[in-house]
Amino acid sequence: MAKSVAIGIDLGTTYSCVGVFQHGKVEIIANDQGNRTTPSYVAFTDTERLIGDAAKNQVALNPQNTVFDAKRLIGRKFGDPVVQADMKHWPFRVINDGDKPKVQVSYKGETKAFYPEEISSMVLTKMKEIAEAYLGHPVSNAVITVPAYFNDSQRQATKDAGVIAGLNVLRIINEPTAAAIAYGLDRTGKGERNVLIFDLGGGTFDVSILTIDDGIFEVKATAGDTHLGGEDFDNRLVNHFVEEFKRKHKKDISQNKRAVRRLRTACERAKRTLSSSTQASLEIDSLFEGIDFYTSITRARFEELCSDLFRSTLEPVEKALRDAKLDKAQIHDLVLVGGSTRIPKVQKLLQDFFNGRDLNKSINPDEAVAYGAAVQAAILMGDKSENVQDLLLLDVAPLSLGLETAGGVMTALIKRNSTIPTKQTQIFTTYSDNQPGVLIQVYEGERAMTRDNNLLGRFELSGIPPAPRGVPQIEVTFDIDANGILNVTATDKSTGKANKITITNDKGRLSKEEIERMVQEAEKYKAEDEIQRERVSAKNALESYAFNMKSAVEDEGLKGKISEADKKKVLDKCQEVISWLDANTLAEKDEFEHKRKELEQVCNPIISGLYQGAGGPGAGGFGAQAPKGGSGSGPTIEEVD
């Protein structure tokens, strides 16, 4: 019996790819057509079901029953605006089944409806068969990749698709992380390197920043757009030619699904041509009502049609840099992943953004993700080859995790972007005397108050022996494993009594948009808070400086050392500033600083004359008010200093 191998599958929106790690290297496996990537297409006909190239090749003849883009539906609700928007572009029907989308097709003369998981499982089955044909024996273990931005229901649904395909899914990993592994094996150089992975595929766009150091990968930040890719560029071309056809032939082909599909196929081909040539021609015989459509498009025109989409790829790059707290000069390597990164304009924008830095194209952008997934699969199967042995992969928690303490405050134990797996422990105590139990409420989010964050779960720890407030010691541990499953345990140290909750990441968690929104909101509020803090400290500094100066010149010990004229000058100016402060408590930071400069110009020459080089009394800011005790409502648990 051959030792069991595991495969790595890049389940793409438009194309999928499979690899296997054996004999110390990765093989990307070609399908029966000799192609190393396989279209993520499934077609249903009167006689059979087709998957991959065979499905894509007959799409123009059978558009209603050829399903693609299942990845855009997987793990989403029917009412999701993304689903609603995409449905307009699809020639196949999507129906609503209890707010779950299903694809309706005609198969062997019957109407059938499939869940997105089922469609994806058919593609996964095809990838599994491609690997089995190459290896010559059955394969069941696999690592499957998803975009970094997939939320938990999308990840879970992808895992379900694997199970439906008869795979034992060892792990779901992020596509950029997989690409980084592929890259890491190629680069064994010493020292820490920051790598930015720019993955623009058929359907999703991900930017990730990783630190690679001595075989250890750490994901520092991820950003992107679950809805940007090669297909969006195809759509722009399709719309352009639909308009051109209207102008030339006074006919609207947009309602004819077969015509649009044939046009789209020609557009995709033209787009690929434009990556290597500056012009591409389209020749479609009898496109609509017997009219032949012969036309051409230049690279410049294509770039113009997609200019806003191309430019929008830089925003997530900036966001990822911000999240990773890195400057663009600190990125050592830029890695291109995904077929759309072959577009010269996209490469140029990225290169210009990084001030002419060379891009790394050594990895075939279509295969990098499957390559890394295959390596990860080998690691999880315990492959002992030295290429793989010292490779470690660290993922991150997308949001901070913590619990509610007195007054509804969010106390984070695990910070956003912390490397997982991780374990954090903190001691808490009771809020009132003889409190018999505590309610542990677990939240995720970036805001200061729990009411603005997302409640993941709660549990009681009861049976705490009567004691004054602040005496009992309750140890709370947050433990996240490599799959992102969170265990929260609370233990009363005096009795050893414990209770716990396991929060799996499959149901009712936040979507990418919500995570994004919460992070953005938190960033926005954080910026507002920062401005407010600076304003208050400028006001306090001015106020204390004015009062210090006032008391300095009124000091009995200075009698005779300061002329009455100077004294009056300082006191009048101080009084003017104090009155201005009373009238302008809400002034901006700049105004407070400006007033202080004015006051210093009057006071400094006089005061420094007095103290001969000794600095005058410093302007100590007033300390912030101590926070008030938390309200009596809410879980009565308090953080121990």
Curated annotation (Swiss-Prot):
Q: Name one GO molecular function term.
A: ATP hydrolysis activity
Keyword list, A-Z: Acetylation, ATP-binding, Chaperone, Cytoplasm, Cytoskeleton, Methylation, Nucleotide-binding, Phosphoprotein, Stress response
Extract the InterPro entries matched here: ATPase_NBD, Heat_shock_70_CS, HSP70_C_sf, HSP70_peptide-bd_sf, Hsp_70_fam
Q: Which residues bind ATP?
A: 12-15, 71, 202-204, 268-275, 339-342
* Residue numbers bearing the N-acetylalanine modification: A2
Which PANTHER family does this one have?
A: HEAT SHOCK PROTEIN 70KDA (PTHR19375)
The protein's name in its UniProt record:
Heat shock 70 kDa protein 1B
Organism, per UniProt? Sus scrofa
